[in-house]
């Protein structure tokens, strides 16, 4: 897990992908809806509906990790300073997307004062490679190597964004102002086009030529329209779509199940199950259960299964 520190405080907001609707605690012991928490999480009552993507709304030391996402980015935004940080990596290799903070309360503020003289509160924007939750361990054999790439990218102007890559960041968000859109360049964008369309319709609501240097942005608002689901697409000079976003349509899905403790060794009836539980306990150095109880159970079930 990479662990960059990002400025916390009243203006901080986590930028999780739009398809993240649930988050887990360490070891998936607890779960919460996201970004609007509606239950109890870390013994805090959020039943009124609280946006836990905002630092100021999380009173106690709290971790949360995205249950899953099909997007390749995660980030943080500071509303006070019009700037933020994005992490970009292939989500098939880097599924872990996490935030941790000391909490916006007397306890957390005491830690802020102890850990820094002048810099104030921070959050940990953590990103997991080959792991979607902590703790999560695996084996690395002799002469084995695992390779990965990840990128940390500053950005400004756009605020909360809906997709990002190594080349660009896009925004498409409805608000009281209208349909807010934006594009931020990480690589030079010459001869590109940015288009916004209603899905299923040919005519574009916006179709503009783009010429942006790195660290520059364009943005705007579409007024007076209320279309159905929209898509925003950034295309290169050859017409290839290099980054896109289709408006996420929230669904009333049940929260995922939290992790459950395995059966005791004597209650296991499958040699494979006994083996995998034992291996898991061995990898995680479990404090109260011995992997050898499960290995011995597997041998007792079938001494010839090896």
Model-derived regions: residue spans:
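A contiguous, surface-exposed recognition patch within enzymatic or periplasmic domains that forms
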Residues: 2-145, 153
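Short, hydrophobic/aromatic-enriched beta-strand segments in well-ordered soluble domains
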Residues: 144-157, 235-236
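Residue-level recognition of tetratricopeptide repeat
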Residues: 305-306
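Active-site-adjacent structural elements in folded domains
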Residues: 133-134, 261-264, 294
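Alpha-helical segment of the N-proximal tetratricopeptide repeat
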Residues: 267-301
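Buried hydrophobic-core signal for structured, non-transmembrane domains
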Residues: 1, 143, 150, 179-183
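Long, contiguous interaction/recruitment modules in multidomain scaffold/adaptor proteins
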Residues: 162-269
């Amino acid at each position: 897990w990479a662990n960059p520190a990002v400025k916390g405080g009243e203006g901080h907001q986590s930028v999780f992908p739009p398809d993240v609707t649930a988050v887990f605690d360490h070891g998936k012991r607890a779960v919460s809806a996201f970004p609007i928490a509606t239950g109890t999480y870390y013994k805090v009552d959020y039943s009124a509906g609280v946006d836990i993507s905002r630092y100021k709304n999380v009173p106690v030391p709290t971790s949360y990790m995205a249950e899953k996402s099909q997007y390749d980015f995660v980030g943080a935004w500071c509303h006070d300073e019009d700037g933020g940080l994005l992490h970009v990596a292939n989500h098939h290799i880097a599924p872990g997307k996490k935030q941790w903070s000391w909490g916006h309360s007397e306890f957390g503020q005491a830690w802020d004062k102890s850990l820094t003289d002048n810099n104030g509160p921070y959050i940990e924007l953590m990103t997991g490679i080959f792991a979607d939750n902590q703790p999560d361990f695996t084996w690395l054999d002799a002469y084995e190597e695992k390779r990965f790439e990840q990128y940390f990218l500053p950005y400004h102007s756009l605020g909360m964004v809906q997709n990002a890559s190594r080349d660009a960041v896009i925004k498409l968000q409805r608000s009281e102002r209208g349909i807010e859109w934006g594009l931020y360049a990480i690589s030079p964008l010459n001869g590109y086009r940015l288009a916004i369309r209603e899905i299923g319709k040919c005519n574009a609501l916006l179709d503009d030529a783009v010429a942006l240097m790195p660290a520059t942005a364009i943005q705007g608002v579409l007024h007076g329209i209320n279309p159905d689901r929209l898509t925003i697409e950034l295309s290169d000079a050859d017409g290839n779509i290099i980054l896109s976003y289709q408006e996420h349509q929230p669904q009333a899905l049940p929260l995922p199940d939290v992790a459950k403790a395995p059966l005791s060794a004597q209650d296991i009836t499958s040699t494979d199950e006994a083996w995998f539980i034992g291996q898991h306990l061995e990898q995680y150095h479990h404090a109260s259960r011995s992997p050898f109880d499960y290995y011995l159970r597997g041998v007792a079930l079938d001494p010839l299964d090896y």
